[in-house]
Amino acid sequence: MSHSGSVLRRNGFTFKQFFVAHDRCAMKVGTDGILLGAWAPVADVKRILDIGTGSGLLALMLAQRTDDNVPVDAVELDAEAAMQAQENVAHSPWAHRITVHTDDIQRWAPRQTVRFDLIISNPPYYEPGVECATPQREQARYTATLDHQTLLAIAADCITEDGFLCVVLPEQIGNAFTQQALSMGWHLRLRTDVAENEARLPHRVLLAFSPQAGECFSDRLVIRGPDQHYSESYTALTQAFYLFM
């Protein structure tokens, strides 16, 4: 199924192979999520866990990138967002292998009897303090419902020995997250610093951690070139998804 020849729909984001409605989700489809979903390593992946799936964006992107026998579990605490994710999945080509769970990951994870070789999350990163317009948006953006130490501990209990935990965070918060992860026994294996253009400092960082030690590969990604069009590297990373690339 492809939406490439269809009329663009409102209240969501149209990709080449699927549509993500997000009008009932606190966090909308954005560059952070698209970067993470396109970047996460999927070679030899057999089972995927998406923590805090929101609209289902990451689950859908990873389903597109993996073999048809790879199950994806997507966990979302907010009932309204989870319902929208379920609808997005149902209208996608991968409804048979993506399961959306309306639950708190801290309750859901201990009940699982299988481990995941890819765990992915676009996690909250603001400390509580500044009020949000809605409780749902606060939940999606603030670490009060899932702090980074808890996320790392849950992932450690759910991951295979050679699996990857992948996140996207603002640069400075990503550095603190890395220190927290290293102190808990994780190993940083992949890091991509993301800048808007060559003249700017990185503002986001893509991180992949593993329980297994190994060499860490680091690089830099620039989103836009001098002409303000998407750079060759960003296009190469995301062109399987963006409708007009």
From Swiss-Prot:
PROSITE patterns in the record: N6_MTASE (PS00092)
Annotated EC: 2.1.1.223
Keywords, ordered alphabetically: Cytoplasm, Methyltransferase, S-adenosyl-L-methionine, Transferase, tRNA processing
Matches recorded under Gene3D superfamilies: Vaccinia Virus protein VP39
Gene Ontology terms for molecular function: nucleic acid binding; tRNA (adenine-N6)-methyltransferase activity
Main location: cytoplasm
Major enzyme class: transferase
Localization of this protein: Cytoplasm
Membrane-traversing stretches: none
InterPro entries: DNA_methylase_N6_adenine_CS, SAM-dependent_MTases_sf, Small_mtfrase_dom, tRNA_Adenine-N(6)_MTase, tRNA_adenine-N6_MeTrfase
GO cellular component: cytoplasm
BP GO terms, sorted: methylation; tRNA processing
Catalytic reactions of this protein: adenosine(37) in tRNA1(Val) + S-adenosyl-L-methionine = N(6)-methyladenosine(37) in tRNA1(Val) + S-adenosyl-L-homocysteine + H(+)
Pfam families in UniProt: MTS (PF05175)
Its biological purpose: Specifically methylates the adenine in position 37 of tRNA(1)(Val) (anticodon cmo5UAC).
Protein name (record): tRNA1(Val) (adenine(37)-N6)-methyltransferase
Lineage: Bacteria, Pseudomonadati, Pseudomonadota, Gammaproteobacteria, Enterobacterales
